[in-house]
Amino acid sequence: MAAIEVGRVCIKTLGREAGNVCVIVEVLDKNYIVVDGNVKRRRCNVKHVEPTDKKVELEKGASTEEVKLSLDAAGLL
C-alpha cells in the first residue's frame, strides 16, 4: 500500500464521490486527511480512499486551482 502523504493521488472508495480521483492536500492525523481535485475539498477518513502509486508535487494546503493544474499536467483529470 502506498503511503498517506501530501501529493499522493488516491481514489475515493466510499461515499457519493466514490470512484473519483483526488489528491491528499493535508494530513490531519492518523485517521483523517484533506482531499481535493476531482472531488469537493473536504476532510476524509483514510479508510475511505485507496492510495495509488502516483504522486504530484504539491505544497501542504495547496489551493484547489493548484491541485487541478497538477492533476491536469500529470494527465489524471
From Swiss-Prot:
A GO molecular-function descriptor: structural constituent of ribosome
Entry-linked CDD domains: KOW_RPL14 (cd06088)
The UniProt record lists the keyword Protease: no
An annotated GO BP: ribosomal large subunit biogenesis
Gene3D superfamilies linked: 2.30.30.30
Family annotation (SUPFAM superfamilies): Translation proteins SH3-like domain (SSF50104)
Keyword Ribonucleoprotein recorded: yes
Listed InterPro entries: Rib_uL2_dom2, Ribosomal_eL14, Ribosomal_eL14_arc, Ribosomal_eL14_KOW, Translation_prot_SH3-like_sf
A cellular-component GO term for this protein: cytosolic large ribosomal subunit
Record keywords: Ribonucleoprotein, Ribosomal protein
Highest taxon in the source lineage: Archaea
Homology family: Belongs to the eukaryotic ribosomal protein eL14 family.
PANTHER family hit by this protein: 60S RIBOSOMAL PROTEIN L14, LARGE RIBOSOMAL SUBUNIT PROTEIN EL14
Protein name, UniProt field: Large ribosomal subunit protein eL14
Species name: Methanococcus vannielii (strain ATCC 35089 / DSM 1224 / JCM 13029 / OCM 148 / SB)
